Regions:
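Conserved beta-strand hairpin/beta-sheet module of binuclear metal-dependent hydrolase folds
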Residues: 1-57, 226-252
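Active-site environment of divalent metal-dependent phosphoester hydrolases
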Residues: 40-41, 68-74, 95-98, 146, ...
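Structural recognition of the beta-strand scaffold that forms the well-ordered cores
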Residues: 32-35, 61-65, 87-91, 242-246, ...
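C-terminal regions of proteins
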Residues: 18, 284-295, 302-371
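Flexible, acidic/histidine-containing loops and adjacent segments that form or flank the divalent-metal
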Residues: 1-4, 10, 81-242, 329, ...
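Short, surface-exposed basic-aromatic patches at helix termini and helix-loop junctions that form
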Residues: 51-55, 77-87, 259-267, 291-302, ...
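Active-site metal-binding motif and surrounding structural segment of the metallo-beta-lactamase
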Residues: 28-31, 40-89, 264-283
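Extended hydrophobic/aromatic segments used for targeting, binding, or gating
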Residues: 244-302, 307-310
């Protein structure tokens, strides 16, 4: 099956985002899929890009919002407003209220009250949902096991999403004891002042030497519960071409994706294409999970066995992390970052004007030290 995956440039400086367009061969020519939309401007650029290459009446078979963070969702609204989308896949937090209720600290909350709070707090998601309904698009929630074109959703499972929801940044306080008992306590993300402090540390960042044999990336990184709710997609395009799209998934989501793939009989370590999660953050991956997904570290000079793309602005000081790129290189990846330019991976289709084969980023012998 012919297919192509386009990573469009999104965001500036410390505000990266995602916007991906997938085209794949079908019985009636081809189908289009859009995954996330980045910010408002990038969402408009996705609309223009599709109109330019496929016409003003182009049909998008499926549009998927991986999670509710603004750097993925703001542009998604523009995509639904500007394109003929048939099926929309997005999580609606308020519908998870009944299942999430036991994991909130306030035991006086009712499912109805909680749903109202969630719908009010996640007004952008509600607005996107409203656009989809107004334009007569079918709306589905993407949970593990569902099929979307040539892709299968590996994560999140509906029950896991209900446990993660109380730990989102805009939800009422979580019941930590209940979540620890459920085995999935992550915690709320850091506040605004903590993020400012992190940026100050970044400017004074230390660099350390890294070799092929001495991997400095560590297990145990922690990302937000919202990121852990990201939709992870396993694509099988026949002829041995397998694709893994990860959104902003972290260790939990990736580990659960591995378990789901194993139960479903989907091979790991045999991908042609992998998305590096969360713009190349070291909080989302570690050696153990990468070994499970990609395979072990290869001897230096072994060559490349798959492509690994990452969305990252060209002027972002923290994304992608060099040690993360090195980790993918060690395991056989040809690593490509957008960094202000659209990048395309294709099988069977000719390159669109402006695209050409790209070379892998090199291995870095100096990487960011941990704090």
């Amino acid at each position: 099956m012919n297919f192509e995956i386009e990573f469009l440039p999104v965001g500036e400086a410390s505000k990266p985002g995602d916007a991906i367009v997938v085209r794949y061969e079908g019985d009636e020519g081809f189908y289009l899929m859009v995954i996330d939309g980045g910010n408002v401007d990038s969402g408009k650029e996705v609309v223009s890009h599709i109109h330019k290459h496929y016409g003003e009446k182009a049909i998008v078979a499926n549009a998927i919002l991986t999670h509710c963070d603004a750097d993925h969702a703001c542009g998604f609204r523009e995509i639904l407003q500007g394109l003929d989308v048939r099926n929309v896949w997005m999580h609606l937090p308020w519908l998870a209220a009944p299942g999430s209720l036991p994991y909130f600290a306030d035991k006086n909350l009712t499912a109805e009250t909680l749903a109202k709070k969630l719908r009010a707090e996640y007004d952008l998601i509600d607005e996107i949902y409203g656009v989809a309904v107004e334009r007569a698009m079918k709306v589905f929630q993407p949970f593990a096991g569902q099929k979307i074109g040539p892709f299968t959703v590996l994560s999140p499972d509906k029950s896991i999403y209900e446990i993660l929801l109380p730990q989102f940044d805009r939800t009422p306080d979580a019941d930590q004891a209940a979540l620890e008992a459920a085995g999935l306590w992550i915690g709320k993300p850091p506040g605004f002042l903590a993020k400012i402090a992190d940026k100050a540390v970044l400017k004074a960042e230390k660099w350390v030497k890294e070799t092929w044999e001495n991997e400095r990336l560590k297990d145990g990184g922690k990302t937000s519960a919202t990121n852990e709710s990201s939709v992870v997609l396993y694509g099988d395009f026949s002829s041995g071409h397998r694709v893994l799209l990860t959104g902003d998934a972290g260790h939990w989501a990736l580990l659960l994706s591995v378990y789901r793939a194993q139960r479903s009989g989907f091979p790991m370590q045999q991908f042609s294409f992998v998305q590096i999660p969360h713009h190349g953050s070291r909080s989302n991956v570690g050696p153990t999970i990468l070994n499970q997904i990609l395979g072990p570290i290869l001897p230096k000079g072994s060559g490349q066995k798959f492509s690994a793309y990452v969305s990252a602005p060209k002027d972002d000081e923290s994304h992608p992390r060099r040690m993360v790129l090195n980790a993918f290189l060690r395991r056989g990846g040809s690593v490509v970052a957008t960094q202000g330019a659209a990048k395309c991976y294709n099988v069977g289709y000719p390159f669109k004007p402006g695209y050409k084969p790209v070379s892998s980023m090199p291995f870095s012998d100096q990487v960011e030290d941990y704090d």
